[in-house]
Amino acid sequence: MNKEEINNNNNQLNTNIIHIGIENNNNLNEENNNINISTNRKNIFYENKETPIYFCSNSEKRIFLKCYGPESCAFYCTLLLFIIPIGSLNIFAFPKIKKKIWKIINFIIGDLIMLITLFSYFNVVTSSPGYEDLNKKITKNEYEEINPVIKIKNSTFKLKYCETCQIIRHLRSFHCKYCNKCILRQDHHCAYVNNCIGKYNHLKFLIFLICVDFYCLYCIIFCIVLPFKEKKKNLGLGRIIYLIVFALFAISMFLTMVPFTFSHIYLISVNKTTREDIKNELYDNVLNNGCCENWKEVC
């Protein structure tokens, strides 16, 4: 249905209720082709089941680091968690490796993994999760008159109104009290990246988690292998204790992050968010279009 057809229908209809029906295969049936629009309101039409035309804001990108605000402490602590481990290995462990070639290899690999992890971290911090368009504000009374409903497969959902942003929210959008914006397909707000994870940065967040997993794995392997390769007297008791404590810390981080990583791989594969999974929203997951199609939505 194009805009001209909608405008022609507007001249014939005098009702204040909008019913928007959208089938999973994007082909509107005869019943869903009837869109009733108030003659004194702008046309509100959904291009597909996922993103309303005037709600798209994927061009909005963040250019400044989010190193301020109520969660800046967690932001800086996360930075230190990445820099201190490899920095301490460079100072206390790498110099004790006898073979120069192994010393160089470990130095390069360790620092390279750290730099890649830091890059992926800043990529998430500075990315835009996707925001609702604030240029289309309406009042609560207008929202109640419109009463927008969206039908997906055999399930019907009423689109909610955000009283803070004064807009009709997309089906999977939620208002974040930290970002003070409505986030498209909000998964969760992550204090460690001081940013929301949403429609346009969920994949970046997953890549960051994978980098952290490899970072922890390298630290574990290095701390376990080094004492066996080098003589104890060369390392000294202090360094051995340091490596044991460091290995235990890396193992605890690894055991925490790996399940978290796989949980996000699973959620993307079935097209669910953390919020929907915890609150059991979207029962039977009507938005699941198959693994490949679900991954295309975040890529």
Question: Where does each model-flagged region fall?
Answer:
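Membrane-associated feature with strongest affinity for ZDHHC
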Residues: 2-299
